Design a protein with these regions (language model features):
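Active-site catalytic microenvironments for nucleophilic, acid-base chemistry
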Residues: 15, 128-133
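Metal-dependent nuclease catalytic regions and adjoining charged, substrate-binding loops involved
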Residues: 75-88, 113, 132-209
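Metal-dependent nuclease catalytic cores that hydrolyze phosphodiester bonds in DNA/RNA
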Residues: 1-101, 209
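Short beta-strand-loop-alpha-helix junction that forms the active-site gateway
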Residues: 105-115
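Short, conserved loop/turn and helix-capping segments at secondary-structure boundaries
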Residues: 116-121, 158
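Hydrophobic residues embedded in beta-strands of well-ordered beta-sheets
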Residues: 101-103, 150-151
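Glycine- and acidic-rich phosphate- and metal-coordinating loops
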Residues: 102-106, 142-144
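Short amphipathic alpha-helical face segments that pack within enzyme cores
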Residues: 121-129
């Protein structure tokens, strides 16, 4: 939502479903740190998502080839729910390694350097949750860009924590019926709501009904 709260406003009532590429990357992630058997992973993937496009088996092979170029820590826990009652947020950690480091899985390619803003926000939200649950400071977490076989550590910065809090305020405002203003760096050129947005930005929900 932090990239463009207006888009979040329009999408807030739409059903959320994972992409086919994510289904592949997610299933592969359970095997990181162990030999990656394409056939085993594919059979698991279609068992979870029976309607998956068969051509994505080629995508799985590309992901495996990329991941085989690096070293990965095997997970001792997967799909761990985390909660912050203070902030009213709930999240999911995809993988936790034996040394306590946590990771989230992405089906996107990696940036040349660093991590995407949305990924930094998610890591920061998880850090808030873990700190409340454990009472210990959380330095950061890893983002695993499966298609490129890249794992990037993001150390949570004060600006990330401020962004989380600001985003939660925007979320609350939208739930109260306010139409948010789009930010200066909003990705309007590739947004499917561009025309709708330009005609209604700045109005309240009550004015649109």
């Amino acid at each position: 939502m932090h990239a463009c709260p207006v888009r979040f406003y329009y999408e807030r009532k739409e059903p959320v479903s994972e992409s086919d590429r994510y289904a592949v990357c997610k299933q592969l992630s359970y095997h990181l740190g162990t030999p990656l058997d394409a056939e085993v992973i594919w059979q698991e993937t279609i068992a979870v998502s029976p309607a998956l496009d068969p051509t994505l088996k080629d995508f799985l092979s590309l992901c495996i080839n990329a991941c085989n170029k690096g070293e990965w820590k095997p997970a001792v826990q997967t799909d761990v729910k985390v909660v912050s009652d203070k902030l009213g947020i709930v999240g999911m950690i995809d993988r936790i390694a034996a040394d306590g480091t946590f990771s989230i899985v992405r089906a996107a390619g990696a940036m040349p350097f660093g991590t995407y803003a949305a990924d930094r926000l998610r890591i920061s939200c998880i850090a808030f949750c873990l700190e409340e649950m454990t009472g210990s400071e959380v330095k950061g977490g890893c983002v695993e860009y499966i298609p490129d076989g890249v794992s990037r550590m993001h150390e949570v910065q004060p600006r990330d924590r401020r962004q989380v809090i600001a985003t939660l305020h925007k979320h609350k405002s939208i739930k109260n019926g306010d139409m948010p203003q789009h930010p200066l760096n909003a990705p309007c050129n590739r947004c499917k709501y561009r025309e709708k947005c330009e005609s209604s930005v700045g109005k309240r929900l009550s004015e649109l009904l």
